[in-house]
């Protein structure tokens, strides 16, 4: 079954992508939740027309995302957490990284930050998806609270 995504769906695709999914997934989840519409020939034609009109806007969005990526690469993020030795009491997740980015003046939604759950002190990398074509590795360090 082919569908057109109305918004980004993790592990499936981005907004306005035409993707093939199993019929049950599309009919019972994606379409009722408003994440997708059925990819009929007329819907594909309308999508192609809309994408053509948005092509010039897309170039500006990609340029802005690349500029933000360069800013993020230059950032040094230090997160503090309570720890006993090398092990944290609790964990650091993408929510904590998003809050640290917001404090530095670069607000990015936590959904676009991918990092595992970190439970030890040290240096790590998070993946930030700014655009479908712009993905940046964000280094961060976790230090113990004093």
UniProtKB/Swiss-Prot annotation:
GO terms for biological process: translation. InterPro entries: Ribosomal_bL9, Ribosomal_bL9/RNase_H1_N, Ribosomal_bL9_bac/chp, Ribosomal_bL9_C, Ribosomal_bL9_C_sf, Ribosomal_bL9_N, Ribosomal_bL9_N_sf. Pfam families: Ribosomal_L9_C, Ribosomal_L9_N. One of its GO terms (cellular component) is ribonucleoprotein complex. Keywords: Ribonucleoprotein, Ribosomal protein, RNA-binding, rRNA-binding. GO terms for molecular function: rRNA binding; structural constituent of ribosome. It comes from the Bacteria. SUPFAM superfamilies: L9 N-domain-like, Ribosomal protein L9 C-domain. PANTHER family: 50S RIBOSOMAL PROTEIN L9. Binds to the 23S rRNA. Belongs to the bacterial ribosomal protein bL9 family. This is Large ribosomal subunit protein bL9. It comes from Flavobacterium johnsoniae (strain ATCC 17061 / DSM 2064 / JCM 8514 / BCRC 14874 / CCUG 350202 / NBRC 14942 / NCIMB 11054 / UW101).
């Amino acid at each position: 079954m082919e569908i057109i995504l109305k918004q980004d769906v993790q592990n499936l695709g981005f907004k306005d992508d035409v993707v093939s999914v199993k019929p049950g997934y599309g009919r019972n989840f994606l379409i009722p939740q408003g994440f997708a519409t059925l990819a009929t020939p007329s819907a594909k034609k309308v999508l192609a027309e809309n994408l053509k009109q948005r092509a010039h806007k897309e170039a500006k969005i990609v340029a802005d995302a690349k500029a933000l990526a360069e800013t993020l690469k230059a950032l040094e993020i230090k997160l503090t957490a309570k720890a006993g030795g090398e092990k944290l009491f609790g964990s650091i997740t993408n929510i904590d990284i998003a809050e640290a980015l917001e404090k530095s003046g670069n607000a990015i939604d936590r959904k676009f930050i991918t990092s595992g759950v970190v439970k030890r002190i040290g240096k790590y990398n998070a993946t930030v998806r700014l655009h479908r074509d712009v993905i940046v590795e964000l280094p961060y360090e976790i230090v113990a609270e004093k």
